[in-house]
Structure formats: structure tokens, C-alpha cells
Amino acid sequence: VLFSCGEKETILLPKSDSTVVKEVRDYSPIYLFFKTKGKDTLVEVNRKNAISSTNWIFHIDKRLPLRLVVPEIIKLQAKKEGSAHKSETSENYFSYSDSLHKNLAFIPFAKLKFLQGKPHKEVMLISKNDFQLTRLKKDLATTTIGFDQNLSFGTYLQYKIAIHNLHLSTISKEEFIY
């Protein structure tokens, strides 16, 4: 799925076959573009239209690795939180393409706190080649999840949607990127 903005930049959005949130009103778009320079992968952030009192929708290229995406999200979350004009009711959302229903869909993450590095407590680690929903136990008080920093954003978002669709109340609001 291609998504473009005014400067003819292209974003390949992640795909899923379900919609978590169908519509978001009063929002500012934030774009994280996939760029290459030689053999290096780079992220280019366009937040020119970000208004702190609105909901923010993050349109992130699915090819970008988490190690590049998460530091930018952390910076933007801090900027929004530190704004004198922020709204207590505004949310942050990741956008993706619902391929089954053929619409743009969203998953909220405003309450989520990203932590970099391996946790010092027991955690469900999700690596680039290993994801098993059955390992998410419903009997744990809290399940903290860690994602491999080399996962593509597209794969990460597919996992997030799958976990969301389990409707577990025990998932921590902290995620580790290791």
C-alpha cells in the first residue's frame, strides 16, 4: 500500500486484516519516511503539521527497523507531553492498511512507554524470527513485552495488532526494544 504526502514522498504502510480503530477526528499527521544512503537505512521525520492539542497519527514506513523508529517516537512523545497546549484527551495512533476491509485503520499507543535495552525482569521477548501468541499467558499479573530492535516496523505492527486482538488486560504499558 502506498501513502504519499504533498512532496511526492512515498510510505509503504503496514498491512493487517482487521481494523482496531476505524476513524480518528481532529488529528495531525506525522510521517516517518524510509530513506537509504549507500548501504545505510535512514529515517526522515516530517512533523511540520504536528499540533500538540490534536490526536497524532503516525504514518510509518513498514520497512524501517524499530532501532530507527523508536527513538523518533520517544522524542515526539516527549515534545507532545511537554507542550503547554497539549490536550489530556488527545491520543497517538499508528496508521496501517486494513487489507480485508480496504480502509486506512489505526491502533492507539498514547499510553505506551518505549524503553530501550533488555529488561531486568521477566519479559516476553519477540525476536525477528520468533512470535508465538500462545506464549502470552492469561494467568500472569502483568506481561511485559520486548521486541527485537531489528524487527521492521511492519512486522512489529502486525504483532501489536495480533496481541491487541487477544483482548488481554495484563499487557504492560511499557515495551522494551532490545
Indicate residue ranges for each PLM-predicted region.
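Long, low-hydrophobicity, acidic/polar, solvent-exposed interaction domains
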Residues: 5-178
